[in-house]
Each structure stands twice: as C-alpha cells, then as structure tokens.
C-alpha cells in the first residue's frame, strides 16, 4: 500500500450514507441509456406531441425501473398541474369509530383513482404554515362546512376546489335525521315522556346541541314530552345523575347523543336497580361495535359512513379531474338497529 493511498482522505460516513440515499434523477437515467436529458424527460413525463421511437421509449423505461427512478412529487405536480393529493381537513372532534370508517372508505375510493388522501387537523393558534400551502393539494375536503375565514385562507393559497360545496351536498341532512329516527323509534314503542342525554366532551358541544335540538323538534312534532337530562362523561357519576334526572322528570326512555353515552346510561340504570328497557329504555347513535357487545345490547342508529365517504370522495375526484360530479346524493343512509335496550 502506497503512502498516497493511506493518506487519501476518506469520505465521511454521513456523506456516504447521504449519497447512498440520493434520489435517482432523470439525469441518472439519461446517463445509463446514453440519451439526452430532454429525450429522457419526454419519455418519463409522457410529453404529448413528441415522436419517440418505441424501442427508445422501452430502453428509457427499463432503465428507470432498474435504477429505481421515481418522479419528484413537486416536479411532477409542476409538469402536470396536479399533485394527486386530496387534503382532508379534520374538525376538532374525537376520532371515533364512525370517523375512522369514513376516512378509510374515502381513502380507498381515492386510492383506486390514483390519489392520496392526507388528513390534517389545523390548530387554532398554529405557528406552522397550513398544510394546504405546502402540499399544493388538488382538492381540499372537510367533514363540515368551512368557516368564511378558513375559506379565505384557502382562496389566498390558490385553492378553489373545496368539498363540501353547498351547491352539491348538504351534510346536515345526514346528521339531522338520526335524532328524528331515535325519537320515532321510542314513540313507536309506546313512550310518551322522553329525555335527552348529551356528551360532556367540550369538543362535541356543537354536535350535541344540534342533535338535542333536532330530537326536541321531533318530540314536539310527535306530541310527546321531552326534557334535557344533562351531559354524560365517562368515569364519573354523571351517567347516574342523568338517569336520576330523567326518572325524576317522568321519562321512560332516553335519547342518547351516541352509543358511548348510551352504554354509560344503561350501566347506571342497572346499578340503580332499574330494568332496561322495561323501566328505562335507551337508544344510542352511531352503532359502534361496543353497542352489540354489551348486555343489554344497545339499540342504535347506524349511519352508512362508508357510503357517505365514497360519495364525498366521488365529488372530490370530479373536481380534481374536471369531470361531471355526482348529480344526486345517495339515498338516506340512516337506519335503526334494534337490540335489547329500546
């Protein structure tokens, strides 16, 4: 070994690792096949209007596969005008079973069309740049109607394709019918004195209010009495207090905000020596797996969140590809699942 070889400076290990992880570029592909970068770019980008011999195209694509070439997302978006990213802006709600199913189905539907769904929960006092400014999504989706301030932010970032669009879908029609079905089911079972029990989670306050108001309106329409039994939290005696309040008001059945509240109410009623549903009936909402697993099992309202997720994904795809949007919303996706509690 010569002194020049031993004295030769070695490349730092972090630099060797960085080089090993370097992204394969179109220039690497061009060097491998001995063609110009322009020709290789035409093939890799499938540029229209270029006459490239088929055997040349195959050489380029074979080399790209062999080298592990992947187009740079930003460069591809710049060339095509699309990022193939759909951004789902989440509200500040708990990620419950229904929301997970909604996101899963929307993700599957978009993936089938070659799009990626990215979820984002913007903080009220966030210091980081909004994700829609860095990802350049083709469409921004939301589970609720966005506020005027949020819409202004999106428009300032150059985003015009936003779901839901009030001209195409009204999400309220899928949330308002659930409490009406709860009340109708209890009335059909002969109950004339109803109570409502909400959730104490502050993140759900708006949804709790909407469901309570809708249930109260349905009770008035049916000519039955309706009282508010209070909010229920997991892990304290609030469910017991709600059961006591409902009984004190003469209620024989409770409309629960969701199945978690319904399970807590049923447990509290049993501990107070009440029979369910003979002394107190309880109906939940959302039909989570737990509803069928407890005893007495929970009668609940099921929303086909999978169908709704695919429908909204279809609107997003139509906007992203400038293709016709679904003209009609899916049929009512809410049904009562009858079990033991009501």
Which residue ranges define each predicted feature?
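Short beta-strand elements in bilobed, periplasmic/extracellular small-molecule ligand-binding domains
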Residues: 110-121, 195-196, 212, 216-236
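Hydrophobic alpha-helical segments within soluble ligand-binding/sensing domains
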Residues: 169-197, 214, 236-244, 301-322
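Flexible loop/turn connectors
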Residues: 240, 244-342
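N-terminal helix-turn-helix DNA-binding module of bacterial transcription factors
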Residues: 1-81
